[in-house]
Every structure is written in structure tokens, then in C-alpha cells.
Design a protein with these regions (language model features):
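Active-site-proximal beta-alpha core segment in soluble small-molecule metabolic enzymes
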Residues: 19-22, 27-30, 43-211
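Conserved PLP-enzyme active-site core in the AAT-like
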Residues: 38
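Active-site anion/phosphate-binding pocket segments in diverse small-molecule metabolic enzymes
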Residues: 6, 11, 16-25, 29, ...
Length: 370
């Protein structure tokens, strides 16, 4: 009886919290300082923690970075900003897309906003409440931002509304990671330099300027201006081998079964066994953020230091893996990505980017920080 209870305890302990995203905050700090080493000492840093810090947990990431030399945090909308405030983040929070209906919340939680069109500028001019703002101009991304031709009108409106305190002016690079588009990137930089020079002439003073993201820092650091925005590089991805991924997604085998030649695995009979096989079932699926295109020998995992391929179609909450050629037991650890399974490699197979694979990880996956 005692032996049975001990075995049960060990098994249940292995099976508890089956799927976990392990996050190494020390690597986060090392990535931060590595990227900072490419900058002038006076260059300020905005940490991008939008989309739940690219799936890593925005409050925990922001609190760690808040201990460092950070100008502020960049989020997508007011809900992300409020979440950080309620989570105890004290520093500057910049909302990239504040929307037209969030004014009272922006004021209540002391959030900065990015103003990128006349509708937003007119709204915050009309409200007459003190607000910290950052202007965004379009230089080729053709997404958010005032056009260069609007510059003089924007400055006139700002000068008529001193309650709007402009802290910086920015734009966004469209393709800073690719050398083949270097001319386009340099043209964006040139346009922005002209915009900022004209802006400073019109206001009769200096303003903080920022254009570079992670890949911009890696490839165009001489154009760093006054401030940079670091996103994916903090989490360990980027065209630089010195950046180390900060996360590792692991689960466990929850069931092992043997199947015969001719048996199928998963929905749609998409995988037919050509021989007798042993398969493991892992409780992670596309609802957790595991891309369904990794089905049927596209995706692979590590079990007991052995490479194993996903077979059958990935389900909403599970996938199956071929363990015929390894020694494995129910409860054994499964590495889905991490030091042994590269997110970059996984993204390339899927014709996507690490950003997507990280940010689509469901929040129901437990995050463990060390």
C-alpha cells in the first residue's frame, strides 16, 4: 500500500501542470544589456511588451525590466496599459493605439498615448485635460502615422493646445531585418530625419526621436537617434546569435498506446501507420497556440533527448507523437520548443515569424519564471 501511494505520488507530481512555458528572466536581462551595448550611453530604451509581452507575460516581464534603465513600456491598447498598472507597473506606459473611446481610462491610469491622425489629435485637443503624448509619422510602412505633408498643421494644433505634452516623435521601419531592402530602410530614415528637423524648427526646440526596433538596432545602430524600441530581441529572437531565447515550452506524455499497421491517427485519417507503432499523446493543441500546420511529420519534439515527430493532425487540445524508437513512459517530459527545438526553425517551416508563434500561446498555459 505504501509503495503504491509513493508510485501514485511520483506519477501525479510528474503529470501536474502538464504544459508549462518556462521563462528565464536572467536571459531577458542579458538580451537587454547586449542590445544596449550597441547604443550610446545616453540613448533611451522603450521595452515593447504588447501582446502579453509576446506571449511571455507582460506584468512579470515589465516588472523585471522596470529594475533596469527603461524609459517606458510600449503596449497596443489601453486594456494592456491598464493591466500593467493594475499589476503594479509604475513606469511610463505608452499606448500605441489608444482609440477614440478610452479617454477617461487613459487619464485615470496615467497612460501616455501615441497620436497618429487628426481624429485623435482633435479629440484630445477638445478634452482640455493634461495628457502625455507621442507623435507618429508615416515614412513608408503605410499603417499608422501622419503624412509628412500634415506636419505644419499638426504643429499648429499642438501649439494651440498646451495641455497636450508631446514627449517624442516616432515612425516605424517596415523591413529593417532584411539586407535586400536596405535602400528602402535608409530612405525611411532619411524621410524621418527631414520630418524631425522640420518639426524641431517649427516648435523652436528639441524633441526625443525614435525609429529603430530590434533589427534596426542590430543593422542600423548609427541611426539610433535619441531612443529605440526593443521588442522581439528582448525575448531572444533576431538576426544575431548573441540573443538567447528566454522561453521553453514543455509538456508531458499523458498516454501511450500501440497501434497496428493500417491504423490511423487523429482526425481525418490523415496519418496511416505503415507498421506497428508506439505513439504518445501530449495535451497541447491549436487552442494552446500550437500551429496546426506542424501536423504529420512537419513538427518535431524532444523526449528523453531523442527527436520525435508529430503524427496525425494536431487537435484542439492534443497532438500525437511517434515514440516507436525510444524508451518513454507516461509522464515523461516533452520539449515543444526551447534550446533544443528552435522557434526560428519552427517559424521557417511554417513560413511565418517567431513573433506569431510566441504571441499566439494561450494564456491558459502556465508561465513559470526563474
Amino acid at each position: 500500500m505504501i509503495i503504491w501511494l509513493y508510485v501514485e505520488h511520483v506519477f501525479l507530481n510528474k503529470m501536474s501542470n502538464e504544459t508549462i512555458l518556462y521563462i528565464d528572466l536572467n536571459r531577458l536581462v542579458k538580451n537587454f544589456y547586449y542590445l544596449k551595448s550597441k547604443l550610446k550611453t545616453e540613448t533611451k530604451i522603450i521595452a515593447v511588451v504588447k501582446a502579453f509581452a509576446y506571449g511571455h507575460g507582460d506584468i512579470e516581464i515589465a516588472k523585471k525590466l522596470e529594475q533596469l534603465d527603461i524609459y517606458g513600456f510600449w503596449v497596443t491598447d489601453f486594456e494592456e496599459g491598464v493591466g500593467l498598472r493594475k499589476g503594479g507597473v509604475k513606469g511610463r506606459i505608452i499606448v500605441a493605439n489608444p482609440g477614440m473611446k478610452s479617454y477617461d481610462i487613459i487619464i485615470k491610469y496615467n497612460l501616455d498615448i501615441v497620436i497618429y491622425n487628426n481624429q485623435l489629435l482633435d479629440l484630445y485637443s477638445y478634452k482640455k485635460q493634461p495628457i502625455n503624448a507621442h507623435l507618429k509619422f508615416n515614412t513608408g510602412m503605410n499603417r499608422y502615422g501622419f503624412n509628412q505633408i500634415e506636419l505644419e498643421n499638426v504643429v499648429k494644433k499642438i501649439q494651440k493646445n498646451p495641455h497636450i505634452s508631446i514627449h517624442s516623435i516616432c515612425t516605424h521601419l517596415a523591413s529593417s531585418e532584411k539586407k535586400v531592402t536596405e535602400n528602402f530602410t535608409l530612405e525611411q530614415i532619411k524621410k524621418f530625419e527631414k520630418i524631425t528637423a522640420n518639426f524641431e524648427d517649427l516648435i523652436g526646440g528639441k524633441i526625443l526621436k525614435h525609429i529603430l526596433n530590434t533589427h534596426g538596432v542590430i543593422n542600423y545602430s548609427k541611426h539610433q537617434m535619441d531612443m529605440v524600441r526593443l521588442g522581439i530581441g528582448l525575448y531572444g529572437s533576431g538576426n544575431d546569435k548573441n540573443l538567447k531565447p528566454i522561453s521553453c515550452l514543455k509538456s508531458v506524455i499523458t498516454q501511450i498506446r500501440t497501434i497496428n499497421a493500417g491504423d490511423s491517427v487523429g482526425y481525418g485519417n490523415s496519418y496511416m501507420a505503415k507498421k506497428n507503432m508506439t505513439i504518445g499523446v501530449v495535451p497541447v493543441g491549436y487552442a494552446d497556440g500550437l500551429n496546426r500546420q506542424l501536423s504529420n511529420h512537419i513538427g518535431k519534439v524532444i523526449i528523453n533527448n531523442e527527436l520525435c515527430y508529430i503524427i496525425g493532425k494536431i487537435s484542439m487540445g492534443t497532438f500525437c507523437v511517434d515514440i516507436s524508437n525510444i524508451i518513454a513512459s507516461e509522464g515523461d517530459e516533452v520539449e515543444i520548443f526551447g534550446d533544443n527545438i528552435s522557434v526560428v526553425e519552427m517559424a521557417e517551416k511554417l513560413n511565418t515569424i517567431p513573433y506569431e508563434l510566441y504571441s499566439t500561446l494561450n494564456r491558459r498555459i502556465k508561465r513559470v519564471y526563474s
